[in-house]
Amino acid sequence: MNRSELNDIIKNIVEDNGCDLYDIELSEEGGHKYFRVYITKPGGVSLNDCAKINNLISPIFDIEDPVEGKYFLEVSSPGLERKLTKPEHFEKSIGEKVKVTTNDGTKLKGELKSFIDNVAEIGKEKVNFDDIKKAKTYIEWNTYKYEE
């Protein structure tokens, strides 16, 4: 099974369980491989959603390993501060605060005002999606105040 077929199977499992597939990531940390499946849904993802989808994907991976060697499967929400790696991530993040690094090293930070024809408008700047090296949403934690 190739990566595209595997992604389609995972996407179908996620969508059949009322969630959307946000991203799939293979990483190595501390000498361990991780196959991460990030899911979203309106109102937020619950621990039960993650466990259910993990339990449906796991038997498939027992038959068809997604990577060579030992790995850990994780299913989770992408979180409040999440990577933006696809055009649809930008489209769904309009109105949120983002940090972007372009291919030439320029750093932009501000509200994602629009994403039209693969061009992100961040504050007063515009940047083409193909010129983005990395991007993520962020939260300004000091703007939240606890009131008794």
Swiss-Prot record:
Among the GO biological process terms of this entry, one is: ribosomal small subunit assembly
Q: Which GO terms describe its cellular component?
A: cytosol
Gene3D superfamilies in alphabetical order: RimP-like superfamily, N-terminal (3.30.300.70)
Please, which domain of life does this record's source organism belong to?
Answer: Bacteria
Alphabetized UniProt keyword annotations: Cytoplasm, Ribosome biogenesis
Q: Which SUPFAM superfamilies match?
A: YhbC-like, C-terminal domain, YhbC-like, N-terminal domain
Intracellular or extracellular location(s): Cytoplasm
Sequence similarity: Belongs to the RimP family.
Cited HAMAP family = RimP
What this protein is reported to do is described as:
Required for maturation of 30S ribosomal subunits.
Q: What is this protein called?
A: Ribosome maturation factor RimP
Q: Which organism is it from?
A: Nautilia profundicola (strain ATCC BAA-1463 / DSM 18972 / AmH)
Gene it is expressed from:
rimP
